[in-house]
């Protein structure tokens, strides 16, 4: 039993020192002040008199009185809610000062400065966090003045979340600076508290089963037997930990501590005899302690894959890496990862004998394994040749070697296995001499991409009996050389990871060498072996692999330096020794075709085969061209026999269909082989280019016609003539003119080996022609051997339409100039003038007739589906701004309502009593300037409301689409065929007008204001509403651009008028048509055109059509009496009225005035558009008869008054913004015009043109009785009563003047001028000269 130790504690009163007395007294006063301050803060009332609040008569509610209220208000103003922590901080400071007495000998000013910085950081960040995240308290900011400054500074830069994160980080740093606590310790403390809480909540303690183990049960039995109480394991461990802590504390003063460091970092085992162990007062070291357990702590946990615990020495992996590097050099940068494969029993693997044996060199360890060439008699150790078999990692598993043949190692035969010796270092390939050239080997048994797998096997030597692999009990713990081993292993793993994964190969059968590498066969034998191949296609494919193996060479031995290995991403390729690569001339001398030449031949055959496939269907033109080509060929053949050209060789051609089919199959197989192996380019191969085709030595030396084909299909035998050196001239190889419609594909009558024929031996210059003929090719037109596969214009020759002169001229052997292929002549000149884009709006294009009676709305651009919502908050702000700006001008007004539209927003102002609306109208420009807007329009009177409107443009303008205006009930339900849409008003409602009720329309606006777009919108509206029998158009377009797009629609009465004289005749015809319609309506007793058409329809329903009452037998060629028919409305559209007035003269004004006065009832309506709204163009007579007007943006208020008789148009925004003054209304309405694109106009026009052609009325633009209407009356008008007398007077006086006629007959000036104009029209007097005088042309009267 243990005894409890007790101690008597007698408290005695001791006197304090003077300094201590003063300190404790001050601490007590400060603590009381903190309590008082807390009471003042908690009882704060905003109504108390304070620093920010002045109150005199109210009682003070604060518990601290007036000072407390004042101090609390100040603290809340400065710190916000953080003021509540100030009393707590004061009390904590007092406690800290009382606990820590002045026992230190010195003051650490650096620590004090760090604490001050931490305090400032905590105060500032706490206030900032409160200002950002907490709610305000009373009328103070939550963070006080300090927090407000920080939050306003951080909000624009980091936003609230970013500012909070930054302040939290600074707060954490400040806490560490102030307290000196590490956040790791804080986290551990918090975790401990949390676990204590959780264990307490679960009614358990953390020490219940912590130290319960088997030893305690053993202790019970020991107590029963021995009767001696043993110490628990927990107590022993705690005592050992305290001992170690004490030793660490005495380390700097105890010299034996430095011996401990030397023992720890010396690399020796701690359980050796000579080592000094330290224990706590003789207690034995714990077997679980890592530092004092020696090798017992890790003895049972052996890991053979651990580089530190696998039992091998440090230098052993370095030697293994060196051996692996040597094997890698032997394989010549194989595409497979480096590996060690265990031997396969029962199989004889192919041994990859390295050309150079390497050995590990002991020395200073570096980052890379150091290797050096081995001596001649060196025998590698078995453990280097066959390292740890049990350590095959997944990336070191045996994989087959699948690479190009240039990467294959040299396999040894069975005989070579027996004679293999360790000291043999015979090189497998030596650098060629000047006379010996390297020759690639055409492999015949295996494809070029599947070499046999090479399995590494140790050299068959007897191991030394004295060496045995042993595993140490435990590796050293503190060898720094193990870092080098780890780096070497990582480098090997990295090289294995970056190498591609090859295809698996069966390993159940032994791999035997089937082929030999290129250096084992002499160059002559290689050529003979290649020539002995019987299949051209197979030999061509294998020759491509052999040519690809050109850069592969083995390493030479005998003092050669170690290979320079490139380390990086991808397979490690060793740099071979310097060898001389065979040149193109040498390859050509052995009959080996270059890869570029074979590719060109295969592509040419592919193009020829494509022409076979595409030339199945022949048109009449192609058949005719073929016939002409056959005639030209026969003529050329006759010329050849005539002049005795005998340079055509005896080339045997296959003439039967079976041979042609066989050649086609061979060509297709060659193309497939080329496509299959075209992607496998060796490392040293150059890409194909046209420069390779112009290599003249190859053309001189290459035997293009060997006795046995090497790499071409063997179905076409070729002869071998004498070769003549011909200098190629590639600049003469001009392709045929690229006209695909006249191309003639090659006919498969006989195979055409023009790409295999030799060059021309006789003519010094090559003769060029088309390489494809329908029958046997002629030599004089045969194209020389030029592989031009990459250029399609050389692969697709064309047959001419007519025989060309070069086919008719005989060949001149002595002519120094070559004959050129003339380009084909273009088609006939009259055919080239027919172009669809030159047709007037594409009249000749065939169109599909629509099935709907009217065009569909799908032809128009649909409006966007998402509409931007109205920002009411921004409108409210603008309303307050308008009120403020009006107040600046001493105008008191309130914004009572606003109407947002697509372009503008109208604010309705309620003016104060006595304020005139004219004051706001006069301030429109000043308001626009003060509101920072483009323009402001003041609406003095809003119908139905006692307010004044102020129209301001929107910040984001919306587009009004014609489709959404046409697709509304107001337009669809209007029965009038003359219904037009204008756009949308300021409220967004569509504005629809009826041209029959206008009855005429005047449109004016400057260039770019949207005038032409508005006219197009009105025309399209009528095209979407009326059939051609309902509405007809007469369009006058002086600019020949705006209305000419409507040419060809069935609504036109005549073609679009672009000549101004024809425009005057069209207006004159309109006046005559108006008079005729009035006569017919008067005969039927109706008042307008609608009543007339109703009468005609009623008569048709009765079956009794109405005859024409004014027809006479001589008026027409009709046998029967013509009947009256339905009359359509006629809309006369003039795009540029000012140009018409300037060109034709004053007569047009009279015609327009007559139409404007009387044409409404006759169904004839005018739409006049002009961009110059001046008084001389829009006269008072026209304005009086055209009440409906549309004003777009104009330049001045004068122009606005010319159009609308009031201002406002100068304040419009442009781009379709208009003021529409409707019929029977004096107040214009602001409308935003519908936007119409040119594509929409063309689509609707094409739709109507597909429905039918226009039925033009003759005689509208021509007048035989007038000279074009250039200012005179037409022949149908009666002459003046005084005309004869005036003619007599002028011819007698020989002087023609308006004033003279006026004085003579005492008439008015206008009548005298009209008489003179009639004389000019009759040819009696001439036109006015430059001085205003007229010359009398008629002779004087006879007396």
From Swiss-Prot:
Residues 45-74, 133-162 are periplasmic. GO terms for biological process: cell division; chromosome segregation. Residues 1-24, 99-115, 180-1343 are cytoplasmic. InterPro entries: FtsK/SpoIIIE/SftA (IPR050206), FtsK_4TM (IPR025199), FtsK_alpha (IPR041027), FtsK_dom (IPR002543), Ftsk_gamma (IPR018541), P-loop_NTPase (IPR027417), WH-like_DNA-bd_sf (IPR036388), WH_DNA-bd_sf (IPR036390). Residues 385-395 have a biased composition (Polar residues). Its main location: membrane. It is found in: Cell inner membrane. Homohexamer. Forms a ring that surrounds DNA. This is DNA translocase FtsK. It comes from Salmonella typhi. The gene is ftsK.
